[in-house]
Every structure is written in C-alpha cells, then in structure tokens.
Amino acid sequence: MPILLFLIDTSASMNQRTDLGTSYLDIAKGAVELFLKLRARDPASRGDRYMLVTYDEPPYCIKAGWKENHATFMSELKNLQASGLTTLGQALRSSFDLLNLNRLISGIDNYGQGRNPFFLEPSILITITDGNKLTSTAGVQEELHLPLNSPLPGSELTKEPFRWDQRLFALVLRLPGVASTEPEQLGSVPTDESAITQMCEVTGGRSYCVRTQRMLNQCLESLVQKVQSGVVINFEKTGPDPLPIGEDGLMDSSRPSNSFAAQPWHSCHKLIYVRPNSKTGVPVGHWPIPESFWPDQNLPSLPPRTSHPVVRFSCVDCEPMVIDKLPFDKYELEPSPLTQYILERKSPHTCWQVFVTSSGKYNELGYPFGYLKASTTLTCVNLFVMPYNYPVLLPLLDDLFKVHKLKPNLKWRQAFDSYLKTLPPYYLLTKLESERILASVGKKPPQEIGIKVKNHSGGGMSLTHNKNFRKLLKEITGETALRLTELNTKEFAGFQIGLLNKDLKPQTYRNAYDIPRRGLLDQLTRMRSNLLKTHKFIVGQDEDSLHSVPVAQMGNYQEYLKTLASPLREIDPDQPKRLHTFGNPFKQDKKGMMIDEADEFVAGPQNKVKRPGEPNSPMSSKRRRSMSLLLRKPQTPPTVTNHVGGKGPPSASWFPSYPNLIKPTLVHTDATIIHDGHEEKMENGQITPDGFLSKSAPSELINMTGDLMPPNQVDSLSDDFTSLSKDGLIQKPGSNAFVGGAKNCSLSVDDQKDPVASTLGAMPNTLQITPAMAQGINADIKHQLMKEVRKFGRKYERIFILLEEVQGPLEMKKQFVEFTIKEAARFKRRVLIQYLEKVLEKINSHHLHNNISHINSRSSC
C-alpha cells in the first residue's frame, strides 16, 4: 500500500503570480489534483494512502495524516493559505517523522536481524516549492539543515531521518510572471539548482525545474511512473575491473582494463523493485540482506545503521548456483550505469557475487549472500539473494540429498558445523531448522497426533432435552422476552453494540399503519417497483435518491473504492497473459480507469489534431472506423446521379459489388427474346415480363437493380461468357458439375448496331441444364455457404461468389440470401448481415419492378 505524502510550500513567496494570473499556490493545488487523477487510472491505486503536510510550525503542519480520509485531504488542500516562512528543513523532518510513526511497532526495520526487502512500506514524498531562499525565525539560511532531534522512540537506530523505502521528489516552480516570446524547448525536464536537489538525490529521488505548464504536466506523468514498490541500495565495486570482452564474446586479456579511473558504474545509488505476490498482493521473501556488523549479546546497544545498505559486488565471473528445494529471492534493478554495463557484456550465464562489509565474524569483507546476474534475454539485471555464504552451503546440501540420502557421515557434520560458525546469529530460523533436521536424521519421526474430538453420536443427552435449547425456543416463539441483562459481558469483552445510523430509513413493509401520510405515495411506488422487479434485491429507497450526493463529495472516489471487493487473482500467474486481439488490435483495456473530468490538456498541444471532417487533417484519411456496430453511427452512402433511375445510393459504395448475383443481360432495340415458348418484341424501350430493358441504355450493360454496371465489370462478364465450353455448358470451378443457364434463352443481336455485343460473338446461343443438376449444385453451394459464414475474418468475397452460382429463378436466390442471413445471425456476423440485407433489398425491389412492368404490359395490350 504506497503512501503518497505531499509537502506544499505555504510561505508568503507562493503568492507570486504567473503570466496567466494564477499564484504559485494555486498551481501547486492543481498539480496535486491532477496527480491524483493520473494515479487513479492505475487499478493499483485503490490501496494508496494520501497525506498532506505544509511549512507551518509542528504539529500544525500536518493537515492530513494517518487518521484522515481522502475527503479531509481534499478539503485541507483547498483551504491552504500562503502566509508563513520557508522552513523546508523542519517540514521535511516532520514529514519523515510522520511516515516513521508506526515503523518501530510494526517491526518493518527489523533492527539487528538483517534487512528484509520484502518488509517495506513504500512512500513517495512530493514537495512543491518555489525554490527561494530558506527562511526561519532566526533569518535566512544558505544551506538545508534537518533537525536531529526526533520525538520518536528508536529513531537513534538509524543515522538518517528517512528509510530505504522512502524517496523524495521536488517540483520547483520557476514559472515566469511575463509570457515568454521564445519558443518552448521540448525534451526532458532538467533538475533544479536549489538546496533541495541534493536531498532528493540522497533519498533516491530527483528534483524537477518547472518553467511552463507543459513541463509541469510532463513531470506529473513521470512521477506517476515513479510510484513503484522497492528499496534503495548503494552498489559499490570492490576489487579490480573485469577483463574486457572481445567481439567474439570471450575475454580479451590483451586489452588492459582501466581499474584506477572512476567509472559511473563503480558506484550506483538505485532502486531494486520488490514485486508483490500475485496471489496475496504482499511481497514474499526468504532471506535478508546481512547487517554491516556482527551482533553480539555483550553489546550495550545496537550500532546505528545507514538508511541505505552498502552492497559491494566483485567483478570476478562465477557460475550461478541454484539447487532444488532451496528458495531464493529475485529482485530487479532499476536501470542505471551498472545495469547498462552488465548488459553490454552480454554474458547471461555468469554472475558477480555481492557482499556486505563487516557482516562476517572472521572476514572483513564478509561472505557472499547473493549475486548480480543479467537475465537470459539481456533485458534487465537481477539481484539474487541467497543464504549467507551460499557457495559453502549449497554443495553441502546437495551432497546431503543426493550422496548421503539424508544420512550424513561424520565428515559432513564437521563441515556443516564449521559453516554454522560463519553464519550470523540473526539467521536463527535457518539454524534451528537445520539442527532439527540433523537431530532427526537416522531416527523415525514421531507420528503426528491429531486433534481428539468427542463423539456425541450416542450415549449423550439429546439436544431437545438441553435446558439452553428449550430456553432459546421459548425466546424465539415469544413466550419470554430476551433480556440483555442475561448476556455474559465477560464472554464478549471486545464487542461493541453498533449505534443507530440516522441516515438509514426504517423499513415500513410490516405494518401499513406505520407509514406517515405524506409518504404513502412514495412508499406505494417503492412497493410497486419491488413487486415488478423480482430479479433484483428489494430496495428501501428510490434509485435516484442514491445519487443525491452533495457537490463537494462527488469527486470522492477513494472511500467508494475501498468498499469494493478486491479483484480475483489470476488462475495461473506464471502463464503469460493472452492478448485481446478481437476487433481492433490497438485497443487498450479501459478497466480500472476512473476519470471524473475530461483532462485532454494533460497531453499538451502537441497531441491535438484537427477533426476528421477537416480537409487538411493528416489523420482524416487514416482514421479507422469503429469495429462495433453498436458504437458506430449509421453511415449514409453518398448520393450520386444514376443515369437510369435518377438519384440514389450506388450499390458499389455500400457493399462489395457482385454483378452476377442478379444477372445482367445484353439488351438492344429490336432484340427478340424467346422465353418459355413466349416470344415478345421489345420496342420503344418497354420492359418485358422477364424484366429486360432496351432503349433506355443502348450499347451498355445495365444491372437489373436499376444501376449502371461499372466499366471494370464488363471485362469480368466477358470472361465469364468466353469460359463457356463448346457444348453450351459451364464447368464450375472446383467441382465436376456443369453449370448452365436455368432458362432457355435465345438472343438475336445486331452486330453492326451494338459494338459491345459484337465483341461477344463467340457466345453460344443456348445454355442448358437439367433440374437434377441444378438441385445438386444448390445443395453443394448451401453446404459451402455454411462453412464460409463460420470462418473468422471479414473476407466475404467467397460468400457472394457462391450466391452468384445459385441455379434457379430469382425466388431461389432470395431464399439462399435469407438462409445466409440466418446463418450469419447465429454467429453474430453483423457486418455480413448488413451486406446481405442490402442484396436482399435489391432482389425484392427488382422482383416488385418486374411485377409492375408485367401488369403495365398486359394493360397496354
């Protein structure tokens, strides 16, 4: 549970104005609120605790501490006034004392027993100041001094006022009072040159020199990323530098290493990440980092320790040692010059041992307690914490299990005893466990004795004859009233009777006469809603009244989040998370985001783009459509001029054009059409009962839907006709069936008048197919349609090609389209359904158009 403490400068200098007219204190308040919004986007922020400290005299400087909730924090933040001195040192000391208030009681520091990285209380101190001179009642101070006296017991056990899991970050406001005419420089925010910078670096943090609002937003984004669970450690090199590695990956002894020149990676002051356990949410570990002294019972008091342990690493390459059934702790190092140097060596199968000076009794440097090793993928460097002096212990345990089979000889016992003498006494649990194992070796362990339970199945008094049971029955039936004086107060000494909450209204369902006259209508409404909504829980008040919250409490999400149940853990935390690839692969998970207001200004002006409708927008042409039909607005297809039917939406602009789904026909004046034994003459552009056009579009291919066929489809049509065999049958691709026309047609075309028809002179005069062949082809098409609808993706070309090959009249094609729509609805293929419905509308309109033309032709006769 991270602790976020905000230290706000309330000195009089915070009243100075910026070029926007706002004071520094107003900017500080807005920065805190913006940080809370950015932090609330992370689901892990549910356990955050916020504190507020000012530059006032203690104890009045603590505005929100351990006992105050989030609402009090926000109220105190809004009521801050700038009217004091710049007592930064005293304010920092008060902040650290507030954080360390409960550490001695909770046992996190574990003085004299090693440093456990998994015992931590990660804290982030964020101070917002103007960076002016430090002032106090004694005058102006040139340097930052923290008072040494502390009222907390046990503070003398640590040399510094902070701990290794507490980091300080400073936002130093340097905003000008006059707008700058120079263009703003983009890039990283530099550190400030004030006195607080050095204090930030000592704790493992840093300072930010804020000169514009954009830089402030950038700093807040960076601070949100800094909220990590971990501890700060000093890594220092001991011994000579390693030999350089050549291009072939081997040691190059011919290239001398510069051991005397100080390199940045020789000494690093960085964080190691302590990840919480995925099952419990709490960090779990096994081995401590040794103390820098050998504990002795004769010491009058423990020597004070430094806040950050000094861990020395030797650059001698060693083999990483791990055995089965022996746990180890693994911590990732924050990126630093040390991690960069180790990764550049590209040796993931070697490690560098780490030591703590004066941790051993007979060795000044101490014995190794772990090692630094690059990951196998060379992406990070990890610190492995093992048992103390593990190069001696691990071979002994390996021999005990594999060679001696848990029956050690005298030589092994002597070697193990000599190892225990080098072990610090605070490894007590390990030592006691080892002694228990040694004592039980060769002996049969005693059988575990279970808990004895009395058998009440027979021989005892019946439950109904029990005096207390009969008394309880009388109290339930109402014969005797339950008296509170009969309760044994000693048995429930820690229990308290809850006070009546006046905000909760009593339920008035039992007796209708208890309802006040003015509440009869409201009560009747509630009873009716409860009666009709049987699937919900019975509510005693209107749902609208639950949202009647004062404006001052509308943004208080923290108290509500604390009441929510914790999210369930992953079933298999070691299994990599499966990416959500359905729909838009670039979609981000919005779960856990909690945003009250639109805060687009966080991204700055560089992320603003024009609206998609503007012509000059670079993003308008690349803007992706929403994948969800429920979220997508209905698009209106562009209206174009149709040379046949006037204005209307073209079919090619809405769904993929498949010209043969409704068969186009070659038409010309004076063309004679023979269909089912009836010969009709097309004159003056009249439409025959079969729906053929004549003069309205001479020498062009006209779609029966009333739209002109695009020119690029004329070639495809000609290819279809030229693929006919000499016997007048079409061989279907991918099958052995032959497909012909469903009707006997004879087209008489004048080659001199129709140039398009003349190009198709090789077309046969008759297309024949039997009804049995058509039925078999349609059954095969229906089976393939079912397969294509079930396929994943949005490639629908094959579906429309199959629909084109359906044999039979127009009513048969309509049935196939309706069948495909039903199949698509089973698998929720909404886009495909939309395309098919458009095709169905075209077929219906064409069928209606044919019927009307047929009636008109008969009436004219």
From Swiss-Prot:
Domain VWFA: 3-227
PROSITE patterns membership: VWFA
Gene Ontology annotations for the cellular component aspect, listed alphabetically: integrator complex
Region (Disordered): 605-626
Phosphoserine modifications at: S617
GO biological processes: snRNA 3'-end processing
InterPro entries the UniProt entry points to: INT_SG_DDX_CT_C, Integrator_subunit6, VWF_A, vWFA_dom_sf
Keyword set includes Phosphoprotein: yes
Keyword Phosphoprotein among record annotations: yes
UniProtKB keywords: Phosphoprotein
PANTHER family: DEAD/H BOX POLYPEPTIDE 26/DICE1-RELATED, INTEGRATOR COMPLEX SUBUNIT 6-LIKE
Annotated protein name in UniProt: Integrator complex subunit 6-like
Species: Homo sapiens (Human)
Organism phylogeny: Eukaryota, Metazoa, Chordata, Craniata, Vertebrata
